[in-house]
Structures are given as C-alpha cells and as structure tokens.
A protein has these predicted regions:
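Pocket-flanking alpha-helical
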Residues: 67-99, 215-217
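Acidic, polar ligand-binding/catalytic clefts
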Residues: 83-106, 234-244, 249-250
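Sec-dependent N-terminal signal peptides
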Residues: 1-7
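Exported/periplasmic ABC-transporter solute-binding proteins
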Residues: 14-56, 63, 67-68, 72-73, ...
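C-terminal motif of bacterial Sec signal peptides marking the signal peptidase cleavage site
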Residues: 9-12
Length: 311
C-alpha cells in the first residue's frame, strides 16, 4: 500500500514538469537508460519486463557490460542507475555529492557464485581452499584436486576480466589478491562461459546462480542439465556432508559459502524513473520475481518446505 501511494504522488507531481537538465521522466513514466553487470541480466530483464507491463508509459533501455565499466558510467554521470555486486566506496559517495548527485545504494537480492564443470567430469565437490589454490596456481590439474581424476589441466573460465565475478573471487575468496593462474580464459558473456564448459571437459566456470535454474521448475532445485554444478564446502577437504550446492535454502541459512549482494546504485538528483525502477525491484512484486528466479530476496517472509531432490 505504501509503495502505491508513493508511486501515485510522484507521478502526479512530476508528470508534466521538465527539469533544468531537460529530463521529463517521473517515478513511473518516461525513458531512461541504465547499466548493469552482464551477469545479472536474467533477473534484471525479468524485472524490466514486468515493470514496463505495469507502467506502459515507462521505457527502460538496458546496457549490459562489465561491473567496472558500469560503475564508471555511473560515476561520470552518464547514467543514473547501475546494478552491481559492490556498494559505493566512501570516496565515490563524496565525489558524487560534490557534483550535486544523490548517491544511494539499495539492496535488491542475494546471489550465489556457482562453480560449474563439464557433464563428463564426475568430481562435483570442492572446498573454498581448493578454489583458492586453483586461482593462485597452486593446483593446476584435476588429478591434483582429486586423485584418480583422468582429466588434464584445469582451465578456469570467467565471463569478463572486469566483471563482478572476477572482483568477487579476488576480493572475497583471495582476500584482495589478484588471480595468478596461467590457464584462465575470459570470454565475453556468461552464456559463453556455460557454452565453453559444455564443450571443454577440463574447464571450470564461475557464474552467478541466476543463470543456472531450470525455468520449468518452480522449486528452483533443478539446474541446467548440460553442465554439472559443484557443491562447495567451507571445510577442507570437501566431503559430501560438508558441501552445499547454491540452492536458495543454503543461501538463506548461510551454509553456502559464496554469496554476494546485488545492489541498485543510484545517483539521480531528480528521483525519477531510475528511483521508481529500483524501488519496484525492492518492493513486494519485484521481490517475488527475485524469488522465482532462484535468487534470495532481501525483503519479505521466507517459507521453507521439504522437497525431494533427484540430482
């Protein structure tokens, strides 16, 4: 109810007014462009489609790029909304405020970082320490990871060298240190990471879990059948009992170790359509879309029920 009232107030107050910058968009109408890390495109596209259906006078034009370029566009005033896996830095907030912007970060979802391997690779358990050793080059072969694995040199596959995925690995898994592995491949998009892993038996790919789920499974417990999703353990060595797949429940209870927040970063002094879209995602309908997509909502009641997993 509160969201509807605010929406109506902004629409009626701003609908016919043009700002000094020439903008005419309101909380629920007009045309804007926004930027997003490409790894979040599935969930952002779902949110955008519903928002534009509910508010047909609004047009949202997405630009999907890497996290670094997305935030640079936001900081330089080329856009008023960016979706990222990191919050503003204090220095960025001060810089934007000095330019009369209004930097605000809104939590919209929790996403898990998933490790995927070829369908022919039977090893599906990995510990955080194993991941650290692979990323720093201490482990280079599958046989170093698990004795008896006949696969050869491990090829690590990322979506983009400047993506939120790489940033998370370096910042949260490696403690701020860079990746040092000679066998790293950076493709252009997350869909290409999945394709690379499908076609290369020695590959291990790192993607956001909103790319994994079978859209026909309302329980979000069925992953893409063309690849294997690894179970990750905080404890080393990884065992079946200590390892978890990036299911919503394990994100919710904290047992899956690789979880990140998705932020809507705003620098819009007008509080127009960028604010409307960001708050829609954080609102009841937007959070239901987040849940349906296999991510974890930041707001709302979570109901847990038992299901059988045949995977």
């Amino acid at each position: 109810v509160g969201f509807s009232i605010v929406l109506a107030l902004f629409s009626s107050c701003n609908n016919s007014k043009k700002g000094k910058d020439g903008r005419t968009d309101t909380y629920s109408s007009g045309t804007i462009s926004f930027v997003s890390d490409e790894s979040f495109s599935p969930i952002i596209e779902e949110e955008r489609a519903v928002f534009q259906y509910d508010y047909p006078q609004a047009t949202l034009n997405p630009i999907y790029t890497n996290e670094s370029d997305a935030i640079n566009k936001l900081l330089s005033g080329k856009t008023w909304l960016a979706f990222s896996a990191r919050n503003f830095k204090n220095s960025e907030i001060q810089s934007l405020k000095a330019k009369n912007f209004r930097p605000v970060a809104i939590d919209i979802a929790y996403d898990a970082l998933a490790f995927i391997v070829n369908k022919g690779n039977k090893d599906t358990l990995i510990s955080v320490k194993d991941i650290q050793d692979i990323m720093t080059g201490r482990i280079t072969k599958w046989s170093n990871l698990h004795k008896g694995n006949a696969h050869g040199t491990i090829t690590v596959v990322f979506d983009n060298p400047k993506s939120s995925t790489v940033h998370y690995v370096e910042d949260s898994i490696l403690g701020g240190k860079p990746i040092h592995n000679k066998n790293v491949v950076a493709v252009n998009k997350t869909s290409q990471v999945i394709k690379y892993v499908e076609e290369n038996p020695d590959a291990i790919g790192i993607i956001g879990n909103n790319w994994l789920n079978d859209k026909h499974d309302s329980t979000n417990l069925t992953f893409n059948k063309n690849i294997r999703v690894m179970s990750v353990s905080r404890i080393h060595p990884a065992t079946a009992n200590s390892s978890r797949k990036p299911y919503q429940y394990y994100i919710y209870n904290g047992e899956y170790p690789l979880v990140r927040t998705i932020y809507a970063l705003l620098n819009d002094p007008r509080q127009g359509l960028p604010w409307g879209f960001a708050h829609f995602i954080q609102g009841p309908k937007g959070q239901r879309i987040v849940m349906k997509a296999g991510l974890l909502p930041v707001l709302g009641d979570i109901n847990v029920r038992d299901v059988n997993v045949n995977q």
